[in-house]
Amino acid sequence: MDIPRIHTISESAHRIHNPFTPEKLATLGAALRMHPGTCVLDLGCGSGEMLCTWARDFGITGTGIDMSPLFTEQAKVRAEELGVADQVTFIHGDAAGYVAEEKVGVAACVGATWIGGGVAGTIELLARSLDPGGIILIGEPYWRQLPPTEEAARACLAGAIADFLLLPELLASFGHLGYDVVEMVLADQDSWDRYEAAKWLTMRRWLEENPDDDMAKEVRANLSSEPVRYATYTREYLGWGVFALMKQ
């Protein structure tokens, strides 16, 4: 069980697999006003930076699930580095359908809502693990401005313009699902750069070390095209944020 290899190559040096900086992750943690001992479930946890740093900074405990063996191992190493291995647990597995054995105070899916077939299904899944009065965290893209054409939307790596909403529409959609939006922290172009541009040096170094790998041609093509594609489309049109929700 793994995610596509191009992602584990291009993001192998990432600690945060979303367009967030460490500062934004810390801002989100502080905004949630979690008490020490709050239990957090993170579905699609990547390399575990959210759980590990929040365990260090806010005293939370938690469990993270991710499909990538590489990222799961990185998460365990990071927990040891930060001295929080006794507070957080990381499991290599499919987060789709995962429900915690004991209810949690915060249930999160930050940038992987495909596990529930979209935002609504992911919220429904997370709610099954949540304490009454708990908080759901959803990380999701939105359009900063509507792409002018469907081709431009696809160049943002969306399937179509209809895949994402404008920010006011996305916020309204949570209300339609019966949830109050109680906090949000949004990516900006600088944090997008840290997510996307960091891939380029990683790919270049990987190519130098693996010139004969079966993936070398695809990685080279990505390295050649991604900077211009990203600057032209994703950076201009696509937003991303983490939204804190509570049942109405």
Question: Which residue ranges define each predicted feature?
Answer:
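A short acidic, Gly/Pro-enriched loop at the edge of an enzyme's catalytic core
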Residues: G97-A107
